[in-house]
Every structure is written in structure tokens, then in C-alpha cells.
Amino acid sequence: RTISSAASDVYKRQVYVVGGLAPDSDQPMPMAMQNNLSNTWQHIQQHIPGIEFNYEFWNPASNSVPRRSTYPACRAVLAAKVQDANIEDAMILGIQRAYYLNAKNPSDVDVLSEIAYSIGLNVEKFKQDINSPAIELLLKEQLQLARQLSSQGFPSLVISKDDKLFGIQLDYNNSATMQQAIINVINVEK
């Protein structure tokens, strides 16, 4: 098989699993953590060409109040997928744009609802679903699965083959190394 056909086969069976690094909180993120994340953004921007961030999110004079709360964004992805399985990618991208480029807080349901509207979801249904027991159950199941996959961070790429899990090292500057790692997993004999 060629790299592109094998990678295409893998892509067809991809499954997103939300990782949920931080549970619900309305408390402001500690300043030390804000500084650490801002520095992480700078590091990423220096090492991955073309990456952009809007640092206004971390500006104390701005209207944003950073919180360490990723579960709302995870629920938003799940609620979008429940409403339309083909729109999961659009919700993920919308959340990333809101956070990284538009300095909007992805733990705010209003921000997540704006994204839902922008990608064509029924916003009223989305608002009901995001806080529903069904989505909460899905979130718990996904968090459990993320732990079982032994992901070392997020995002992660894990391939399941023959009941074995293979972590793929992410390389944002050279996709060929990831493609080759995927091919190597595909070609592993039982």
C-alpha cells in the first residue's frame, strides 16, 4: 500500500475522544497557570510555522476571565455530534478559533452557543443537550476511554489494531513522519 491510501483507510475510521483536562469551574485560573499557558503558546508559535494565537485572552485588562475548565467545550463537541454526526469537526475547529484566534472563553456556554449557531446547529436544542444527563454520561464514558488509551496529552493520536493500542508521536512540522508511523502500525504482523 502507498502511504496515502493506507492513511486514507485509517482516516475513514477515525474516532474523536474528548480528553477533558479540567472539570467545571467558574473560578478564575491562577495567574501562574495563565502565564504558563501563555508561554506555552509562545513556544508553539516559535516552533511551528504558521501558527497564530491571540494573546489578548491572557491580558488582565481584557474582558476575558480565563478559567481552568475544559469540560464545557468537551460537552459542546458531544452535543454537536449528537445533533449532527457530520458536524463534529466543525465544532472542534470553531472552538479552537474562538479560543486561540478570537480570545473567547471556550468554557462559556454563550460562546459555545455562538459556535453552534455559526456551524448551522439548532441552538435551542444545543443549549438543552449540552447540559443534559445524556451528554454528561457520554462525557464520563469518553473521559474513561481517554484514560484507557493512556494518552500522554491532548491532542493525541492512538491507533487500535488487533486489540493493541499504538501511540503515534505527533509531528506538526513533518506529517510524513506520522504517516510512516501509521504505515508501520498497519503493517505490524499479529
Give the residues covered by each predicted segment.
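Single conserved hydrophobic/aromatic residue that forms the stacking wall/gate
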Residues: 1-7, 11
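Short, glycine/charged-enriched secondary-structure capping and boundary segments
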Residues: 4, 29-30, 172-173
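A short beta-strand-loop structural module common to alpha/beta enzyme folds
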Residues: 12-22
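Non-catalytic, surface beta->alpha helical segment in thiol-disulfide oxidoreductase systems
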Residues: 162-190
